[in-house]
């Protein structure tokens, strides 16, 4: 059976004001575009979200687990789980299943007590970063981010950089959509989602 290629580009940028997550909205299977309107950034709480690259079913199952754990933590301890704690939990879940892995590559970002951003691979490898990218278009996206990132940039500048990175990846990677970018901005004031569309 021939393996079908899927792809995407998701990025995360952390600045002093918060975290920006961005992703294309195209879902592909092999050489076919399944849809141009899929959400690849999933909220876990009102202050933490993950980006999805890899098996859709695996990501959805992990998101449900994280949501349940976050609710349980809040109920038990009376305070929200931090982004760092949730990233470590996700890393442990993935590592425990390394012999039958979830086929995912995830960026987790949030602002609970401070902005935090991390990437987690399918075996649970966890790295906290200032910026990162995942998916088939990530080499193109990360080049744009590395060229434009500054630690003192505003959240609005970070958003513009993230959108540009995903759009550039879409121009070079056939498995990444370039018509629309989903953007989630998380600050001390909460989470906001928007879609940036481009004319063909």
Curated annotation (Swiss-Prot):
Residues 1-7 form a propeptide. One of its GO terms (cellular component) is proteasome core complex, beta-subunit complex. It is found in: Cytoplasm. Keywords: Autocatalytic cleavage, Cytoplasm, Hydrolase, Protease, Proteasome, Threonine protease, Zymogen. InterPro entries: Ntn_hydrolases_N, Pept_T1A_Psome_bsu_arc, Pept_T1A_subB, Proteasome_bsu_CS, Proteasome_sua/b, Proteasome_suB-type. It comes from the Archaea. Its main location: cytoplasm. The formation of the proteasomal ATPase PAN-20S proteasome complex, via the docking of the C-termini of PAN into the intersubunit pockets in the alpha-rings, triggers opening of the gate for substrate entry. Interconversion between the open-gate and close-gate conformations leads to a dynamic regulation of the 20S proteasome proteolysis activity. It catalyses: Cleavage of peptide bonds with very broad specificity. Belongs to the peptidase T1B family. The 20S proteasome core is composed of 14 alpha and 14 beta subunits that assemble into four stacked heptameric rings, resulting in a barrel-shaped structure. The two inner rings, each composed of seven catalytic beta subunits, are sandwiched by two outer rings, each composed of seven alpha subunits. The catalytic chamber with the active sites is on the inside of the barrel. Has a gated structure, the ends of the cylinder being occluded by the N-termini of the alpha-subunits. Is capped at one or both ends by the proteasome regulatory ATPase, PAN. This is Proteasome subunit beta 2.
């Amino acid at each position: 059976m021939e393996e079908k290629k899927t792809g995407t580009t998701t990025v995360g940028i952390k600045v002093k004001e918060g975290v920006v997550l961005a992703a294309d909205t195209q879902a592909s299977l092999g050489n076919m575009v399944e849809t141009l309107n899929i959400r690849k950034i999933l909220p876990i709480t009102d202050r933490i979200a993950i980006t999805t690259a890899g098996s859709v079913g695996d990501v959805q199952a992990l998101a449900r687990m994280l949501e349940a754990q976050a609710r349980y933590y809040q109920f038990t301890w009376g305070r929200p789980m931090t982004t760092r704690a949730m990233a470590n939990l996700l890393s442990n879940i993935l590592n425990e299943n390394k012999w039958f892995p979830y086929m995912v590559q995830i960026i987790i970002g949030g602002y609970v007590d401070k902005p935090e951003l991390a990437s987690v691979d399918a075996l649970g490898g966890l790295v906290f970063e200032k910026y990162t990218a995942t998916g088939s278009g990530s080499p193109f996206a990360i080049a744009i981010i590395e060229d434009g990132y500054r630690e003192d940039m505003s959240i609005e500048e970070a958003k513009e950089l993230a959108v540009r990175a995903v759009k550039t990846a879409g121009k070079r990677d056939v498995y990444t959509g370039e018509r629309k970018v989903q953007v989630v901005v998380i600050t001390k004031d909460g989470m906001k989602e928007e879609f940036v569309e481009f004319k063909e």
